[in-house]
């Protein structure tokens, strides 16, 4: 699958432009001795908004990781967006991770639901139910329901979602972005087999999060 997005996310272009202009102006006025912190800031902003292509596993029943980060939860929990008990796997993204979100499975979107909320530390459990969040519920061709939830964090105050109910999604397809540290919860049917453990570092699209029961 071709990756139809620039390696530096469009969401970051305005921030990069501002950081570059500030660094150039200060460099022109005061030289590198005064400007180096602003050049360093520019490097940080560029790396934050990187959005590289990732290999996508071909395994048909695989649930792919929707985001870069670290696993903070693997547990049975209530999926409030699909009204069921489910296997919940949570990925926490710090400010150094790639912050685009990608579809964990192939399927059709049955629901997209946004909830305003707080901005607690996204690494803690209650962020799942109390923070600002956006849920995308996906139905696979085999009738499985997979819910992917973007959750804002302590610093992240902007959730971007580019898909709507009724649209198709392909595994690994980019569908959203959260700025400056956040979390993604994935709810899977009971019987799915988790392939990751708490504390494990994971990568969007290339890490297999779980396997759906066949």
UniProtKB/Swiss-Prot annotation:
Note on how the cofactor is bound: Binds 1 pyruvoyl group covalently per subunit.
Gene Ontology cellular component terms for the protein in this record: plasma membrane
Gene name per UniProt: psd
Enzyme Commission (EC) number: 4.1.1.65
InterPro entries assigned to the protein according to its UniProt record, in alphabetical order: PS_Dcarbxylase (IPR003817), PSD-A (IPR033175)
Protein name: Phosphatidylserine decarboxylase proenzyme
Phylogenetic lineage: Bacteria, Pseudomonadati, Pseudomonadota, Betaproteobacteria, Burkholderiales
Source organism of this protein record: Burkholderia cenocepacia (strain HI2424)
Pathway: Phospholipid metabolism; phosphatidylethanolamine biosynthesis; phosphatidylethanolamine from CDP-diacylglycerol: step 2/2
PANTHER family in the record: ARCHAETIDYLSERINE DECARBOXYLASE PROENZYME-RELATED (PTHR35809:SF1)
Record keywords: Cell membrane, Decarboxylase, Lipid biosynthesis, Lipid metabolism, Lyase, Membrane, Phospholipid biosynthesis, Phospholipid metabolism, Pyruvate, Zymogen
Role, per record: Catalyzes the formation of phosphatidylethanolamine (PtdEtn) from phosphatidylserine (PtdSer).
Membrane topology: Peripheral membrane protein
Keyword set includes Lipid metabolism: yes
Quaternary structure and interacting proteins, as annotated: Heterodimer of a large membrane-associated beta subunit and a small pyruvoyl-containing alpha subunit.
Annotated family: Belongs to the phosphatidylserine decarboxylase family. PSD-A subfamily.
Post-translational modifications reported in the UniProt record: Is synthesized initially as an inactive proenzyme. Formation of the active enzyme involves a self-maturation process in which the active site pyruvoyl group is generated from an internal serine residue via an autocatalytic post-translational modification. Two non-identical subunits are generated from the proenzyme in this reaction, and the pyruvate is formed at the N-terminus of the alpha chain, which is derived from the carboxyl end of the proenzyme.
GO MF entries: phosphatidylserine decarboxylase activity
Modified-residue entries (Pyruvic acid (Ser)), positions: 182
UniProt-annotated location(s): Cell membrane
GO biological process, one term: phosphatidylethanolamine biosynthetic process
